[in-house]
Amino acid sequence: MNYREEILKLENKENSGCSGALVPGIIRKGKGHKFIVFGLNPAEAKDDLEGFFNKKFYIFDPDDEEASNTRSQRRWTKKISDILPADSQIIQAEMIYWTSQNRKSLENLIGKLDFGNPYFDLSQKINNDLISNNKDALIIMLGFDHIDLFEKVFDLPELEKTINGQNNKRLLYKYKSNNKFFAVRHPSSRGLTNIDKEKIKTTLESSII
C-alpha cells in the first residue's frame, strides 16, 4: 500500500481544507526494538508552515529529507526518543493523517472522527496495514486526551494497570490481555520529569518479548 498516493488521491477527490498531511514512517533508525508511536494527528507548527508556504497541500514524509527535516520534526523526534528504550526504531503514525491545530479545528474541517468519515476510514486502513507489516512492534499512544479513539479503533480491552509518575499523575496505561498496546503521558506534558521518562522506558523494556 502506497500511503502517500492514497492520501493524495483522497485529498484531490475531497479537498479537506487542511494545510497538509503526514505519511507514516521511520523517524529514527535503531538496532533495538521497534515502536509505532501514535499521536492524534499532525500539528501545524509555524516553522513547518513557513517552510512549505508555497505549497497548496504539503506532505511530511520520512523518505523525503526536506519534508522530514523541519525544526519541529527534529524537536518531535527528540521528545519521543526521550521516553523510549535506547536505540529503538521509531515509526511515527497518527490516528488521523491530516494536519490541524487541535481536534476541534480538525473536526470543523473534515467532520466527526468516526467510521464512515473518509479521512478517518483511510487513516485506519493505513494504520491496519502499518501494524500488519510490523507485527513485532509495540504500539504506543501519546497522551490520554484522545484515548477514546485509540481504544475504539484497535478494539482494546479494559485497562489492566495504571502506573503513576513522580507527581502521582497518570504516567502509563497497560491493557488487559494485550501486551502490545500502551498509552503513555504525552512527552510534552508539563511536569514530566527525567525519573518519569525512565519509568516509562523501563516499563516498555520489560514488555518486550
Positions of PLM-derived features:
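C-terminal capping/extension of enzyme domains
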Residues: M1-S16, L113-Q124, I147-I209
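Active-site and ligand/interface coordination hotspots across diverse enzymes
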Residues: M1-T70, W76-K79, S123-N133, L171-S177, ...
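A structural signal for short, well-ordered beta-strand segments and their strand-loop junctions
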Residues: F35-G39, S88-M95, L138-G143, A183
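Short, solvent-exposed loop/turn segments at secondary-structure junctions
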Residues: N41-A45, I96-S100, F144-D148, H186-R190
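Alpha-helix C-terminal capping segments
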Residues: I80-L84, L204-S207
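Internal catalytic-core helix/loop-beta-alpha segment
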Residues: D82-K135
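Acidic, glycine-rich loop-and-strand cores that form catalytic or ligand-binding grooves
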Residues: L130, K135-D155
